[in-house]
A protein has these predicted regions:
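Metal-assisted phosphate- and nucleotidyl-transfer catalytic regions
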Residues: 270, 348-454, 480-498
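TRNA-recognition modules of translation machinery and tRNA-sensing kinases, especially anticodon-binding
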Residues: 300, 304-307, 323, 327-338, ...
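Short, Lys/Arg-enriched N-terminal segments with co-localized hydrophobic residues
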Residues: 83-94
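Hydrophobic alpha-helical signal peptides and transmembrane signal-/tail-anchor segments
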Residues: 24-27, 38-46, 54-62
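Short hydrophobic targeting helices and cationic amphipathic motifs
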Residues: 6, 16, 30, 35, ...
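Class II aminoacyl-tRNA synthetase-like tRNA-binding/catalytic domains
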Residues: 96-336
Length: 537
């Protein structure tokens, strides 16, 4: 056994390159047939100039030449290079590597709409959405991730036989692109063949290929994995994706850092009885009502943080606006001058997101018949003033001075739409009695807090405000509430060691989506709702 430096050639992405390897050579001193493995070596490639390690390769050399330059006849023996990078030596593949590059074989609707493929043969993947058999010709509509595509099947020309195709079969169609104004996308594919990738074993229990499914919400939810294949149903969740995308993009642009807080804890951030309790390795635990404590902790780390994640509320409500699990869009920001900074940040998010939906989700909005709300300016009104306005305008008595009843929220939304043509309104300075212990009281009137709700067409979609950042003030507030600090030691720790003035909010994603789309039930805009009666699917 001896150490030997040897010059070698390697082929990477089809380019012949000269490299150097070194390693221990196990040499055979006796004749070995060409078909046998003559040499086994463990080598590593290095950059000749910097000696930087570039790869570690286990080589199995075939044949009887083990040193020196490769013979010319060997250099020509390399196998064809596929889309994967391969190492060759002596004309043989040693191993291949993933490079992150994919070879595009099929096209998308957006590719065809660019005009590049008109009159050309293409491959396109999709599920058979609907088949309209017209005799010698059939229209096979495919459902793709970008929408519906009409393909033309010609008897005697297209393969396989039409009877082999069925709705919901996954296929790859091969055909020529032709302009057709009457087709869903303004073009059609004149099919040469359909490759059937898979076929269903049972017919659909629900007519998902109709523009509007004529069925109840409960049936749609029972069959949710299938009902979501309806193009209008899935369009709702494309819009919802746009909302979350807007939330992330806008806050990133404002210097926020995304965090991921735990959803199992020892206690709830909001207190109260609306907690889901569970056993956690012989300990008591709860599902997170909110990421509130963790958001505040992370303000001391990053100044500005946000999270889009599920929260859990064990509230026994059975209404069109309540869920027991929903997605909360939360942010918390430090070094604020006023709780109005938080409202301004939310206004900026809404403006950015509506523009994003208008430009990049126009197809879905048109399909759903949505007109986006106005967010140029959002009015704000004090809690007590809002109650007075509604009572006076709509001849309604104030029954609960400490909170807004659902009917009052609706009337506040109606009032500002009628008087100011406003779709949103901030209601500020909620009573301290109805806000959590960490809410900062208004120094001018401690019966009220520096907090707010955002109403959208009369429905609360956001709760937020400024938090207490002074340790002693927080201790006093906890004592005034008759609470104990037990179980909150880590939370209180951040205030002992200094926190900046800060505040934040939480937005209910499903509620916001519901109001944007004009739905009247939050379950319509929840992928798989969890409520009093539903744990499946």
């Amino acid at each position: 056994m001896r150490c030997r430096y040897q010059q070698n050639e390697r082929k990477y992405d089809g380019v012949l390159q000269r490299g150097w390897y070194r390693g221990f050579i196990f040499n055979a001193d006796f004749p070995v047939p060409d078909s046998a493995i003559a040499v086994l070596g463990l080598f590593y490639f290095t950059d000749k100039e910097s000696s930087r390690l570039t790869s570690l390769v286990l080589f199995f050399f075939m044949g009887d030449t083990v040193s020196g330059d490769l013979p010319p006849e060997r250099r020509q023996g390399a196998a064809p290079v596929s889309k994967r990078a391969k190492y060759y030596t002596r004309g043989r593949i040693i191993m291949d590597f993933m490079t992150g590059k994919t070879e595009k074989k099929t096209v998308l609707i957006s590719d065809i709409l660019s005009g590049e493929y008109e009159g050309k043969e293409v491959l396109l993947n999709g599920a058979v959405h609907k088949i309209r058999d017209m005799g010698e010709v059939a229209f096979v509509v495919l459902r793709t991730r970008e929408g519906l595509v009409q393909t033309v099947y010609e008897e005697g020309t297209t393969t396989p036989e039409l009877k082999e195709l069925c709705e919901e079969a996954a296929v790859t169609v091969k055909g020529t692109v032709a302009l057709e104004e009457r087709a869903p996308q303004g073009f059609e594919i004149r099919a040469v063949s359909f490759e059937i990738l898979s076929k269903p074993v049972e017919p659909m229990p629900i007519a998902i290929n109709k523009w509007k499914m004529n069925t109840s919400l409960e049936t749609k939810l029972d069959l949710r994995p299938l009902s979501l294949r309806n193009v209008k149903e899935r369009a709702k969740f494309r819009v919802q994706e746009g909302i979350v995308r807007g939330f992330r993009d806008y806050l990133h642009s404002q210097g926020f850092t995304e965090i991921h807080s735990p959803k199992i804890g020892a206690r709830g951030a909001e207190g109260g009885a609306n907690l889901f309790r569970l056993e956690y390795f012989h300990k008591h635990a709860v599902l997170a009502q909110s990421p509130q404590f963790y958001k505040q902790m992370m303000v001391g780390v990053f100044d500005r943080v946000f999270e889009a994640a599920p929260v859990f509320r064990a509230e026994k409500h059975n209404t069109k606006r309540h869920l027991n699990e929903y997605t909360s869009l939360d942010f918390e920001m430090g070094y604020i001058d006023s709780f109005e900074d938080i409202m301004e940040m939310e206004t900026g998010f809404l403006q950015y997101t509506m523009k994003l939906l208008e430009t990049e989700y126009a197809k879905e909005l048109k399909m759903l018949g949505v007109t986006l709300p106005k967010v140029d300016e959002i009015p704000q009104v004090r809690f007590d003033k809002a109650k007075e306005l509604v009572a006076e305008k709509y001849n309604r008595k104030i029954r609960n001075p400490f909170d807004l009843e659902p009917e009052e929220e609706s009337l506040i939304g109606q009032y500002f739409k009628e008087e100011m043509d406003a779709d949103f309104v901030f209601v500020t300075h909620y009573p301290s009695k109805k806000r959590p212990f960490y809410a900062m009281d208004d120094p001018e009137d401690t019966n009220y807090t520096l907090s707010f709700d955002l109403l959208f067409h009369g429905l609360e979609i956001t709760t937020g405000g400024q938090r207490i950042h002074d340790y002693l003030a927080l201790v006093d507030k906890i004592a005034d509430r008759g609470m104990t600090q037990e179980g909150m030691e880590q939370y209180m720790m951040i205030f002992k060691h200094g926190m900046p003035p800060h505040g934040g909010l939480g937005i209910g994603l499903e509620r916001l989506t519901m109001k944007i789309l004009g739905e009247d039930n939050v379950r319509e805009t929840t992928l798989f709702p969890r409520d009093l009666s539903r744990l499946e699917p």
